[in-house]
Swiss-Prot record:
GO cellular component: nucleus
Organism: Schizosaccharomyces pombe (strain 972 / ATCC 24843) (Fission yeast)
Protein name stated in the entry: tRNA pseudouridine synthase 1
Protein's GO biological process: mRNA processing; mRNA pseudouridine synthesis; snRNA pseudouridine synthesis; tRNA pseudouridine synthesis
Pfam families in alphabetical order: PseudoU_synth_1
Amino acid sequence: MGRGGKRTWYNGDRREAKRNRPNSIYNGEGRPENLVVGEKKPKRKVACLVGYCGSGYHGMQLNPPSKTIEGDLFDAFVKAGAVSSYNADDPKKVALARAARTDKGVHAAGNVISLKLIMEDEKLIEKVNEHLPPSIRLWDVIRTINSFNPRTYCESRIYEYMVPTYAFVPPKPSSILGNCIMKNSPMPAEPINKENINQLSRSLFYEEGKEFWDDYDIAAKEILSLYEQDPEGFVNPYSKRGAAALANSENNKGSEAGVSAKTNPDMDSDSSAIVNEFLKPDSVEDESAGSKIDPSYRLERALKHIEVLKLKNYRISADRLSVIRETLNQYVGVHNFHNFTVGQAFHQKNSNRVIRSFTASDPFMIGDTEWISCKVHGQSFMLHQIRKMIALAILVVRTGCPVERIQDAFKKTKINIPKGPGFGLLLESPFFKGYNEHKAPENNRDPIDFTKYEQKITAFKHAHIYDKIFLEEARKQVFHCFLSFIDSYNEEDFSYLSDIGITEKTQEVSSKLPDVLSSDEEEDSAENKDDLEG
């Protein structure tokens, strides 16, 4: 038997193995049993404009058996008849590709995937959307040139990151980080020159921080006084049981139970609902009144309630907003972002990235919490880069650190930068300027553009992305937990935020420590991390 015969036997064996292997592209489920094998129909290369909420998904790209956005999309294409039964077992057969491979939990108002679809049905978009959950939408299907690949033709991307303004409140003076800053970063001499952004930022750290935490201390002392009077009988006035006691106290003048309304001015019904959702252990306390719960635990929860409510009532000043904007502006340009991802060395060429703009919106209210929207426009991003950029900006602003510390992070010294919470990040839109201006018109193809779907996309963002972000923050106080962890972490690890700056010792400390707040997302994919964004 010659080489040809050997090759025939080998290929046949491979085909048999391929037929028999289990199919797992349908987000961990088997291939739909109702697929009917029919005649082969012509396919066309297209760009699909999509939007999605990433909550509950293990990222954008197919990764069997994990649940992914592309898994749901491909399943919908098959069920709508846009992918034939011959190709339903393997997305590679239809050349599936994407513009941005968003990370676990990251959302997208606009993203682009390309593949070869059967385009016979005029109602294809409607049919595909019928097979998708409301949190994933197909905006349009656009014919492209045959060589189109959204990743290589995508010239830049805009990401949006939602931040509650209380994230910029200075750390508590008694915390490890707060003490480190006060010990190593003195208040600038009077008078403060507000045109000097670093003097302004440092003065805000001391003045605004003192005002905020002094106000907290007053409320906390009243709670401590109640606790000291009767530790065993102490009831958290911010729990459901405590609120009932407060109402009873107000109805029965002269009663000593509970606290006065003046002691608890922030306890409106909405705040109570949100806080009780966040601090669910207190509902256990209500069910076992008089019980086995340690009184010191009740005190701890009461003090936490006060802190949460004070943070929710924080409103950002114009001066602090100007510091935020100047801090974000430090990222603009071509810089080495080896400190803003994982497994990347300073000398590697692909550590350099282009940031075209980084802006912060005016503050806006959602419920009783104030937010700002930060938008970064860049050529491409590495794994966790945006979340680390946001986290460092927050730390620089809230500690009164010189804004140039951002520039220091682009240098060779390795420093430890934590990842900001992932749920607040969304891909706004990828851009295909070169393709739209040259390749598309030259080949009689429509441009790839999201602008004509702006109203639909805005409505989708509010219904399925923003609301999820705001609700998760209201329920879990994610940013508060994140910053509380940072504030209580090893002093040496974040001493670079003080006037000590980045030194050789900073690198020694960082090299000995794992990435702060690392999670299963950190190891999501060591390979192709250059393609994994957020």
